[in-house]
């Protein structure tokens, strides 16, 4: 029997409500789908019938997921919820149900099977190269840049970096 870890897009598509397979979410995803929980008792029923389990990934899997996200260049596009779903999938050896391209890219880099929900999913794994449109700074490693999840700034001039896929 395949275990699946769900991100919030699976709930928007109704996946957990139409499947009898056991599924897992993290507490961060559980909190993210709060507006769905308010409208439906279905999420609570899934938990009570053990078709949905809330589980937290171990720190070493979170760290591995963050490292993989930084290596692929996707880290700035991932939320804590995203990182937690990747980490839990890695820890459990579970399939990851998501439509998020950045989540899919990192998961596939970690050899996690990704199940898209309402899209065709990603075709190729990508490593992103960051560059500055202002001073033409170009480096796929963003460790020298000032990084936050909302903005990646050029270490030379402070402009917002853009990204493009690296040619393999």
Describe the predicted segments one by one.
Residues 1-6, 10-83, 87-92, 102-168:
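Feature 3881 marks metal-assisted phosphotransfer/nuclease machinery
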Residues 96-97:
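Conserved SAM-binding loop
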């Amino acid at each position: 029997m395949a275990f699946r870890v769900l991100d919030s897009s699976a709930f928007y598509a109704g996946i957990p409500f139409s499947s009898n397979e056991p599924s897992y979410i993290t507490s961060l995803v559980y909190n993210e789908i709060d507006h769905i929980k308010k409208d439906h008792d279905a999420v609570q029923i899934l938990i009570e019938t053990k078709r949905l389990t809330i589980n937290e990934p171990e720190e070493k899997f979170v760290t591995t997921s963050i490292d993989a996200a930084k290596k692929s260049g996707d880290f700035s596009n991932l939320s804590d919820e995203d990182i937690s779903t990747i980490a839990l999938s890695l820890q459990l050896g579970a399939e990851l149900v998501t439509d998020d391209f950045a989540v899919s890219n990192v998961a596939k880099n970690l050899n996690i099977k990704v199940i898209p929900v309402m899209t065709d999913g990603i075709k190729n794994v990508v490593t992103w190269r960051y560059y500055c449109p202002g001073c033409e700074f170009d480096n796929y490693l963003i460790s020298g840049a000032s990084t936050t999840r909302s903005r990646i700034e050029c270490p030379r001039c402070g402009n917002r970096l853009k990204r493009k896929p690296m040619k393999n």
